[in-house]
Amino acid sequence: MAPMGIRLSPLGIGVFCLLGLGVLYHVYSGFLTGKFSAFLLGDRAEDPGPGEDTVDLRELLAVSVRAAELGGLEVKKVRESNSLNEKAKGKTMEGADDKMTSGDVLSNKKMYHLIKNAFPALKVNTEEKVEADDEDAVSWDRNIPDDIKEQIKTKHVASESITMWIDPLDATQEYTENLVNYVTTMVCVAVNGKPVIGVIHKPFTGFTAWAMLDGGSSIKKRNSYNEKTPTFIVSRSHSGEVKEVTRQTFGNKTEIISAGGAGYKVLSLLDVTDDKQETADVYIHVTYIKKWDICAGNAILNALGGQMTTLKGEEIMYTGSELNKGGLLASIGMDHGVLVEKLSEKLQVNAKKPAK
């Protein structure tokens, strides 16, 4: 007998069961719909909002700019005081001394600790080794410059998806030769391996270029590029092979600029208000190159509609190994696919490691 003397008929039991199943169906279908929507959206899912496990990319851009500037002050101070304390920390891929100076070390210390003190959870890869006891109390004042506020909206991403790449002094060889126009400090932010924020700072002129993918920038591409007879920019340290192959591909009269520093070379493709900045249409590098040398430039080019790829035209991912073994080809305002196709006929598309 049912409680309180209520007798349930078979029909009543059936109705009750159907109602229960209906409630469960709606709850579960709502859950599945949410999961399916998230799957479809993928990376386009809504901003997760502020939280302990997220970072605002606008803030990260601001601290990256500040880090590049602070590092630049150290670089300039050391050079002007002529207290470089130059030494070799190994060999480059071309067999030359891989030089390090006090400028590299002090810039690295400021840049690394500014970012880590502001965002302790983030993974930061840097060219110079950071000792566990080598701390710096430098802190970010949380100030976001007006030009960033005006262009960039708040956007939160998961902290674990971020990898940062720092080059505290790009073009160290030229720095020791007092060819300071080539010198830059650089910061890059990659999300899930893709470069989305880039900062390139020239310490000796005070010029800073920054850009954020799907956001804004402080720099723009030039009004025109020469696709018929492009000017190429290559490294000073191993220009022989690149010049030969480039002229075989594009003609013996092709103009080729030899320059120091990957940051400087990327800026040569853009509209830079600096009388000492050379201009080119295409940047080529045929040997191994470290990711902290190229990540910032890659992010800036991506944000402005340009491309930086391996010599095979493959996307460069900024996770895992610090080494990009595929060489690189960078352009903007050009048909990048055509460049890859032409060069692949002449270049050894698997960038080779030179004999030491």
Curated annotation (Swiss-Prot):
Record-listed E.C. numbers: 3.1.3.25
Residues the record lists as binding Mg(2+) 1: 127, 167, 169
The protein's annotated pathway: Polyol metabolism; myo-inositol biosynthesis; myo-inositol from D-glucose 6-phosphate: step 2/2
Source taxon at top rank: Eukaryota
GO molecular-function term, one example from the UniProt record: metal ion binding
Protein family according to the UniProt entry: Belongs to the inositol monophosphatase superfamily.
Protein name: Inositol monophosphatase 3
Alphabetic keyword roster: Hydrolase, Magnesium, Membrane, Metal-binding, Transmembrane, Transmembrane helix
Cofactor annotation: Mg(2+)
Leading EC class: hydrolase
Chief location category: membrane
Protein topology in the membrane: Single-pass membrane protein
Catalytic reactions of this protein: a myo-inositol phosphate + H2O = myo-inositol + phosphate
PANTHER family, sorted: 3'(2'),5'-BISPHOSPHATE NUCLEOTIDASE 1, INOSITOL MONOPHOSPHATASE 3
Positions annotated to bind substrate: 127, 169-172, 293
GO terms for biological process, alphabetical: inositol biosynthetic process; phosphatidylinositol phosphate biosynthetic process
Cellular localisation: Membrane
Entry annotated with the keyword Glycoprotein: no
Example of a GO cellular component annotation carried by this entry: membrane
